[in-house]
């Protein structure tokens, strides 16, 4: 387990930040606040991918964010303000925070500093902050090293992170597949010992599973890992799953292959119950 403060890495990175974010950053800096690019955009840039979405984090409180942005002429939305998140110019800006309560939507938040914000994140590779002033990555948990080694590791105790939101188990699997790497032993053991997805909606499980298939460098290995960690039967509960995996990244083809031993009508009824769309159910059942 990596503990906060074990490691602080400041590594240079040339991140092509959109011009409107640069403008937002400029007015935050003018008003004495920090603004970082966080999470997936930083991870993808390190991997040599072009980031699609840019999430931002700041030490400014939500009301301060809104005030600064409006004075700067940016459109704002207060959706999520109670949880420290607002939209500025279409970009999500979150105040450094600690979640109170479990699950995807905490009951409340406490505001904190960058170190506290890092500790609420799921995986080390998603806990990287890009400092636009210095063109540097701030890494408090060894995420850069884990990315280079293609190792999936949680921030802090794995069981605690998964207890906060069990969907994180599927996210860990997805990222292990998408980077073509391995799962840290503690993370793998935590999932295998308690693969439960209790409290997670069928829609979220479906969406995460589909993303896992589509983004995996080797879908066969992704599914084998899901099976070995005893979580695959909870992704497709009630089915007799075919364990002869293929490498296709087409999730329709892949799910049809997983259910090839099942009765046609059971597939239709089961997938409907798991919130697959009418078209998805039709396409998958057609291939059975």
Report each predicted region and the residues it spans.
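Catalytic cores of the polymerase beta-like nucleotidyltransferase superfamily
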Residues: 2-288
């Amino acid at each position: 387990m990596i503990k906060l403060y074990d490691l602080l890495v400041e590594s240079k990175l040339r991140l092509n930040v959109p011009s409107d974010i640069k403008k937002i950053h400029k007015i935050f800096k003018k008003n004495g606040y920090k603004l970082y690019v966080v999470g997936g955009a930083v991870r993808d840039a390190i991997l040599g991918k072009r980031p699609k979405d840019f999430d931002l984090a700041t030490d400014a409180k939500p009301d301060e964010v809104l005030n600064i942005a409006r004075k700067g002429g940016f459109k704002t939305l207060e959706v999520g303000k109670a949880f420290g998140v607002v939209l500025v110019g279409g970009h999500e800006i979150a105040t450094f925070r600690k979640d109170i309560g479990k699950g995807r939507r905490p009951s409340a938040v406490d505001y904190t500093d960058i170190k506290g914000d890092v500790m609420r994140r799921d995986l080390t590779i998603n806990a990287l902050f890009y400092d636009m002033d210095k063109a540097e990555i701030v890494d408090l948990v060894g995420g850069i090293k884990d990315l280079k080694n293609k190792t999936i590791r949680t921030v802090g105790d794995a069981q605690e992170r998964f207890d906060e939101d069990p969907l994180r188990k599927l996210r860990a699997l997805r990222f292990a597949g998408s980077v073509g790497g391995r799962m840290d032993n503690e993370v793998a053991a935590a999932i295998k010992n308690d693969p439960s997805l209790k409290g997670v909606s069928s829609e979220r499980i479906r969406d995460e599973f589909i993303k896992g298939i589509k983004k995996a460098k080797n879908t066969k290995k992704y599914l084998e890992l899901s099976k070995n960690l005893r979580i695959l039967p909870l992704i497709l509960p009630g089915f007799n799953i075919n364990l002869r995996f293929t490498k296709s990244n087409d999730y329709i083809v892949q799910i049809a292959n997983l259910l090839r031993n099942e009765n046609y009508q059971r597939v239709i009824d089961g997938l409907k119950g798991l919130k697959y769309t009418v078209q998805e159910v039709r396409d998958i059942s057609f291939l059975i």
